[in-house]
Amino acid sequence: MNKEYERPEAHDEIPAKISELISLAESAELSKENGIYQNIPGGDMPGDHININEQAILAAKRLFPLIREKLVSTVRSNPYGRAVISVSGGSGSGKTCLSALTAWYLNKCNVGTRIISGDNYVHRIPEENDAERLRIFRHNGIRAMVESGQFDNIIFERLQSYQKEQNETGHAKDIEEPWFKTYIEGGKAALDQHLGSSNEQNFEMLNDIISAFKDGAKELWLRRMGRDNTALWYEKADMTDTHVLILEWTHGLSKHLSGIDERIFIRTTPEETYASRIGRSRDENAKTDFIQAVIAIEQTQLTKLIPSADLIINRAGEQLSKDDFD
């Protein structure tokens, strides 16, 4: 990334403004009646919708005392008064709402804050990404059968019938034959290697953006990804008065991601994740067995990464102990 960019002057008053965050959060009235409730802007993912409710507001209010000290010290130590926070968690964990509320409150304190969605930095558009995941699952499932000596034409015809139904993972609990178990396990093992890897996610581009922001860049080109291959573009973002960058992303704890000052993780149950996903307009396929298998693998991966978080909370914003996840 080009580092010959204009840099703003540092703002010494920003730490004091951040310190006002808690009192503002406690006094600000967010409700369905006053209209603010529905008009809080979300992130920068095209077509994304947020559903802010009372639980999300309570979680945000509980979060502020937990992040204020670290946020103030980080802003003070950066020559441009800047800090980067990641809000991560499983799909449907509430990270979009929490990020939106945190940004809204900070902006109300005149601490310029911008949200970027990591979902804009997948290598492939959603439809192609889902297709690639399915290809990897099927290819490696069949390879596992071949390598274990469990593949023949008769078995392949049976497998194809399940594949044409787009539901082989849905049959996993019903078919107990060894060859099918090998297929499912081989496919899932390959998915585990692919999901959240640099083959799927463009960590390099995100790391460049984070680095440039902390280095004082006044402008950044941010990626936008819609639902099809005509909806992929870049927008120039004015960062002159932005002091906090919130990365809202499932993979905010990834070892491939650098430059994050405070990593926040929202711990949810599989039931909470499922209920949230099916209620979102951009997740029409959330109920499919294959997507549920993908979510389960991602959830396992995220659980292993929880100890690397700086702060762990539940959906209600209550702090959880790291000792429970070591």
Give residue spans per PLM region.
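NTP-dependent small-molecule kinase module
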Residues: 1-78, 262-265, 275-283, 299-326
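Walker A (P-loop) phosphate-binding loop of P-loop NTPases
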Residues: 92
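Conserved lysine of the Walker
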Residues: 95
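Hydrophobic positions on the alpha1 helix immediately C-terminal to the Walker A/P-loop
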Residues: 98, 102
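Post-Walker A helix-loop "phosphate-sensing" segment adjacent to the P-loop in P-loop NTPases
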Residues: 104-114
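Conserved nucleotide-sensing/catalytic segment adjacent to the nucleotide-binding pocket
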Residues: 113-114, 121-229
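A glycine- and Lys/Arg-enriched "phosphate-lid" helix/loop adjacent to the NTP-binding pocket
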Residues: 136-139, 189-195, 257-258, 262-302, ...
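ATP-dependent NMP and nucleoside kinases share a basic, alpha-helical "lid"
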Residues: 175-182, 231-280
